[in-house]
């Protein structure tokens, strides 16, 4: 009759949430500390500034060129024979080089085109129309045979203007030889006396000749002259000579045209075609073309040019002069004449 009621389970009280989301009786409070790590930027050292690269404002314009005739490289002075005689030639200055030598002339300035009126041979720079002409000794050879009519006209005009001057100089006696006729008149008086023996007469003549030679104004024997270029006579009274010949100067009163003698031949020639050589100096002929570096005092010369030694050998180079410029040149490319 009597039934037992099931015990009602009392709902357990939910604990109140505390601040900061902490549960009661959950143990000691744990605090978390977050440290912000600041990345320290390492100061990178700036690299040293690069040196300014030299800029060539007048570079060569090289193009592949087939060399029909044997040519020497203007850098290494060796013949261009590889790759079926193909090389590089500058469009402006006509410089010939190997393909593997192009890096050596990267910073060398181009001389530019040669005026067509001055395409003349290095052996006769004023009046020759041959190939391989040069305006200046620093300029490379040209590969053209063309001439300028203006240049030819000026050349003829110079020749005509010099004719009267040469004739006038021929009429006048050479001042170097004027002393001899002044001393000749006393000879008849000596013959009239008849008291001087033959031996004494010969002695007096020899003494007079020695005096004339000593008193004769002119060039000293401490030096002589050598032809730099080949000069072809244009007139009958011109002196024809080859490059490297020794010339005896007779008259140098004119600045442009001198009178000289080679062997038994005598005549006029341009004064800038010869160079004075001292007794202790040597004369050389260039056997190979060479492009020198001006920054270290080297000189650029072409084959068959005539130069004069001006210094001793240093590390295979000697100081030479062409009359217009002086510089260092390899001794192996020179032949003494």
Curated annotation (Swiss-Prot):
It is a peripheral membrane protein. Residues 220-279, 280-337 form the SH3 domain. Residues 1-11, 167-176, 184-212 have a biased composition (Basic and acidic residues). This is SH3 and cysteine-rich domain-containing protein 3. Residues 1-61, 162-215 are annotated as: Disordered. Coiled coil: none annotated. It comes from Xenopus tropicalis. Pfam families: C1_1, SH3_1, SH3_2, STAC2_u1. One of its GO terms (biological process) is neuromuscular synaptic transmission. The keyword Zinc-finger applies. The keyword Zinc applies. Gene3D superfamilies: 3.30.60.20, SH3 Domains. One of its GO terms (cellular component) is T-tubule. CDD domains: C1_Stac3, SH3_Stac_2. It is found in: Cytoplasm; Cell membrane, Sarcolemma; Cell membrane, Sarcolemma, T-tubule. GO terms for molecular function: zinc ion binding. A zinc finger (Phorbol-ester/DAG-type) spans 59-110. Required for normal excitation-contraction coupling in skeletal muscle and for normal muscle contraction in response to membrane depolarization. Required for normal Ca(2+) release from the sarcplasmic reticulum, which ultimately leads to muscle contraction. Probably functions via its effects on muscle calcium channels. Increases CACNA1S channel activity, in addition to its role in enhancing the expression of CACNA1S at the cell membrane. Has a redundant role in promoting the expression of the calcium channel CACNA1S at the cell membrane.
